[in-house]
Design a protein with these regions (language model features):
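The conserved beta1-alpha1 loop
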Residues: 13-17, 122, 165-166, 225
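A generic secondary-structure signal marking the coil-to-beta-strand transition
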Residues: 11, 39-41, 160, 217-220
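The feature captures the conserved acid-bearing segment of alpha/beta-hydrolase catalytic domains
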Residues: 126-217, 223-229
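Serine-hydrolase catalytic machinery in alpha/beta-hydrolase-like enzymes
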Residues: 1-3, 7-93, 97, 102-116, ...
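Short, charged low-complexity intrinsically disordered segments located at boundaries
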Residues: 65, 103-105, 109, 209-221
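Hydrophobic anchor at the start of a short beta-strand
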Residues: 92, 118, 161, 219
Length: 231
């Protein structure tokens, strides 16, 4: 978007899923059109195929340090964009699809004060996987044990979370979306409000549940009826 003198605009960081690249996510999400209309910057980091042949972010590989290294590279890219463009550092948000959602969650947990909000689309709840095998199990809705909310982050307040999950997702079990929201809500002392159904025209209906702590929305679960593993 055209930036006026002394103006600072928000930044949205979009993280692609497996088998995608930055260009594919930009095209499927049409986020550039939204950014031009609503006036914000978009950054599309791209996974190195030498790091993962399928183009997946290694969000789960925290034991070897690969996940943290990739998160650090993305964070460095964000810092660089903030130096080069008129970005408002107080209005930076993360969004990710599938493996990108897992990496977005990791970034938010590592830097809870850096980001205003995070959106996880068809992703895995943070902390439930630490290897490719456990990641695949989590995708199928299997996990060894529930994760304690206290393990998520330090005492810093987590950024607001939006989880988008399709009810017909054949890749990531819908229970993962609910688990991510459960962890975020428990960590923030939030309670679920009444579910509401939103449908616009012939689009898929969305069942939305807000989790609030007093007046603040800590997390929102958006379950889209009939949606598969797609933006």
């Amino acid at each position: 978007p055209g930036v006026r003198r002394n103006e600072r605009l928000p930044l949205l960081v979009m993280l692609h899923g497996c088998g995608q690249d930055a260009e594919a996510l930009a095209a499927s999400s049409r986020m550039n059109l939204v950014a031009a209309r609503e006036r914000f910057f978009v950054l599309y980091p791209e996974q190195d195929r030498l790091s993962n042949a399928a183009g997946c972010w290694n969000w789960y590989d925290t034991r070897s340090g690969r996940a943290q290294a990739e998160a650090g590279s993305i964070d460095a890219a964000i810092r660089q964009v903030c130096l080069l463009q008129a970005v408002d550092p107080e209005r930076i948000a993360l969004a990710g699809l599938s493996a990108g959602a897992g990496m977005a969650a990791l970034l938010a947990l590592r830097h809870p004060d850096r980001f205003r909000a995070i959106a996880m689309h068809s992703g895995i709840a943070p902390g439930v996987a630490h290897s490719s095998a456990t990641a695949l199990m989590a995708m199928c809705g299997q996990r060894a044990a529930p994760i304690s909310p206290e393990r998520l982050a330090s005492e810093a307040r987590l950024p607001g979370l939006l989880v988008i999950q399709g009810s017909s997702d054949p890749v990531v079990a819908p229970s993962n979306g609910a688990e991510a929201v459960r962890l975020w809500a428990a960590r923030g002392g939030a309670k679920a409000g009444a579910r509401r159904i939103v449908q616009r025209g012939a689009r898929y209906a969305a069942v939305i549940t807000d989790y609030r702590s007093r007046s603040r929305v800590v997390a929102t679960l958006c379950e889209i009826e009939g949606l598969g593993h797609a933006w």
